From Swiss-Prot:
SUPFAM superfamilies in the cross-refs: Aspartate/ornithine carbamoyltransferase
Name the UniProt record assigns to this protein: Aspartate carbamoyltransferase catalytic subunit
Annotated source species: Agrobacterium fabrum (strain C58 / ATCC 33970)
Pathway in which this enzyme or protein is active: Pyrimidine metabolism; UMP biosynthesis via de novo pathway; (S)-dihydroorotate from bicarbonate: step 2/3
Enzyme's top EC category: transferase
Example of a GO cellular component annotation carried by this entry: cytosol
The protein's role, per its UniProt record: Catalyzes the condensation of carbamoyl phosphate and aspartate to form carbamoyl aspartate and inorganic phosphate, the committed step in the de novo pyrimidine nucleotide biosynthesis pathway.
Gene giving rise to this polypeptide: pyrB
Superkingdom in the source lineage: Bacteria
InterPro entries: Asp/Orn_carbamoyltranf_P-bd, Asp/Orn_carbamoylTrfase, Asp/Orn_carbamoylTrfase_sf, Asp_carbamoyltransf, Asp_carbamoyltransf_Asp/Orn-bd
Enzyme Commission designation: 2.1.3.2
This protein's UniProt keywords: Pyrimidine biosynthesis, Transferase
GO molecular function: amino acid binding; aspartate carbamoyltransferase activity
UniProt-annotated binding residues for L-aspartate: 87, 170, 224
Length: 313
């Protein structure tokens, strides 16, 4: 058996090929559990998971909650809107308060990059990063990798085109790191205004034209246009953005005939993706949601078994 050497999951950066493979293999087992009639196990019975979301996210929070409950953990969702944070309590104060409750794992989403890492320094339990600013979203990258691997058989050697608002996307960053680590070829496709500085140093091919970027791709991963994170005008108009960078059936023809269409959600239909593609036969968007629960089950079990029992997983 292989030992998982990490106490926290703060990002994909720092995970080895072996670490990622271990989590994906364990997530494959979790898929089987989730498809059974009796979905609940006792793996984490007696352990406590706190979901601390400073940014609203129905999908991700629900996925983490379901993952914990399927493993038998006691799960508490902390509503920041009604918490002491709104009354002026700092992130560190919140961390110390929660630490005193002696949870076993803290799942945190925050608008500031590095928030999860900061909490990990202040609490005795494991910390899972559910998204921190524009930095990373590790479980999203893992669920995307699992979706691709189950559909294509492997990650090594495939070509993945990540398209859209790369600048503001923690999903893009985590996926680029993971896919490179696993031997995939990664392209990013976006207007120059939505590309971060230094993107060419991340071992990716950069395209400003959709059809060129999608040419013979095995996977087309669309990103949400994150207008809430934009302080200026990054695109002339939504209509023009869709014309040049929205994925429709015509643009998709540039990719391989059996290319997968992915989106981390929530989708802006008619902005970065057309309904005909999102709901089409090449779409694996619903599968991504299913794989999300499985991956988060795998992460929770791997971290908590390692931390609390010192077992090899």
């Amino acid at each position: 058996m292989v030992f998982f050497p990490h106490r926290h999951l703060l990002g994909i950066k720092g995970l080895s090929h072996q670490d990622i493979t271990l989590l994906l293999d364990k997530a494959d087992e979790a898929v089987k559990i989730s498809r059974q009639r009796e979905k609940k196990t006792s793996t984490l019975r007696g352990l406590t998971q706190i979901n601390l979301f400073f940014e609203a996210s129905t999908r991700t929070q629900s996925s983490f909650e379901l993952a914990g409950k399927r493993l038998g953990a006691d799960v508490m969702n902390m509503s920041v809107g009604n918490s002491s944070v709104k009354k002026g309590e700092t992130l560190i104060d919140t961390a110390m308060t929660l630490n005193a409750m002696r949870p076993d794992v803290l799942v945190v989403r925050h608008s500031s990059a590095g928030a999860a890492a900061l909490l990990a320094q202040k609490v005795a339990c494991s910390v899972v990063n559910a998204g921190d600013g524009q930095h990373e979203h590790p479980t999203q990258a893992l669920l995307d990798a699992l979706t691709i691997r189950r559909a294509k058989g492997e990650l090594s050697g495939i070509t993945v085109a990540i398209c859209g608002d790369v600048l503001h996307s923690r999903v893009a960053r985590s996926n680029i790191i993971l896919l490179n680590q696993m031997g995939a070829r990664v392209r990013v496709v976006a207007p120059a205004t939505l590309l971060p500085s230094g993107i060419r140093d991340m071992s990716v091919e950069v395209f400003n034209d959709m059809k060129e970027g999608l040419k013979n791709a095995d996977v087309v991963m669309m990103l949400r246009l994150q207008r809430e994170r934009m302080s200026g005008s990054f695109v002339p108009s939504v209509r023009e953005y869709f014309h040049y960078y929205g994925l429709d059936a015509e643009k998709l023809k540039a990719a391989k005939e059996d290319a997968l269409v992915m989106h981390p959600g929530p989708m802006n239909r008619g902005v970065e993706i057309a309904s005909e593609v999102a709901d089409g036969p090449q779409s694996v968007i619903e599968s991504q949601v299913e794989m999300g629960v499985a991956v988060r089950m795998a992460v929770m079990e791997t971290l908590l078994v390692s931390q609390n029992q010192g077992e090899r997983v």
